[in-house]
Design a protein with these regions (language model features):
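Ribonuclease/tRNase effector modules and their secretory precursors
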Residues: 1-212
Length: 212
């Protein structure tokens, strides 16, 4: 990341190759001592020939604190995740939602800080499958924003030193009764950097653990 010859497009491509390789080599999730297939939607292409699911884990969005700057008359992020990270040196977008090169949906902007943390995806998944104490996991029923249907989520959180990474899967079942798990659908994963998100996940984990 501190390479003086840093090239943004090359870095994005290399990050995408890591993403593809990991899900090519790791197709199962071990939940309650049973291995289940992982499914991932890579057909919904969004930008630069890469799927929306990839851009979601490598970008910032409204959930990261967008507000309207009344002086500059534009939307801005309240916190830059890379402010104390070397990725800030190489970022050409600077979280500027008005940059014409951005073609992501839903007020999202590519984030090389989150891209630089892509290796945590593999680390966290491997540790979860190994039942490592470095992993906290919990399940939570949520309502889909699009369909308004209830869904059950599995959230996996990896923390070590300055690393704080979360992965989310949706439970999929063999039939409508939802009595038997058939697979897990990968939803998203990202480095956590803001206190609000950290506290929300802390609360969810404590609430789940108290009922276990």
């Amino acid at each position: 990341m501190e390479n003086n010859n840093f090239d943004y497009n090359t870095f994005v491509d290399e990050t995408y190759e890591k993403f593809k390789t990991y899900f090519t080599d790791n197709k199962t999730l071990k939940y309650n001592d049973t291995e289940y297939p992982i499914i991932i939607n890579t057909r919904d292409l969004e930008f630069d020939g890469k799927p929306r699911i990839f851009w979601h884990i490598c970008s910032l969005g409204e959930e990261n604190g967008i507000y309207f700057d009344v002086y500059k008359r534009r939307l801005k992020f309240s916190v830059f995740p890379c402010i104390n990270h070397s990725s800030s040196i190489h970022c050409k977008l600077q979280c500027n939602l008005e940059d014409k090169s951005i073609r992501l949906k839903d007020n999202r902007v590519p984030c090389i800080y989150r891209m630089s943390k892509i290796d945590n995806l593999k680390i966290a998944m491997d540790l979860f499958n190994q039942k490592s104490s470095q992993i906290k996991w919990w399940t939570k029923k949520e309502t889909s924003n699009s369909s308004k249907k209830s869904k059950k989520m599995l959230k996996i959180r990896y923390t070590k030193d300055l690393e704080d990474y979360v992965i989310m899967f949706e439970f999929r079942y063999t039939d409508a009764s939802k009595n038997q798990i058939s697979k897990f659908q990968f939803i998203t994963a990202y480095q956590i950097f803001d206190n609000n998100t950290k506290e929300r996940f802390d609360y969810e984990y404590i609430e789940f653990s108290s009922k276990a």
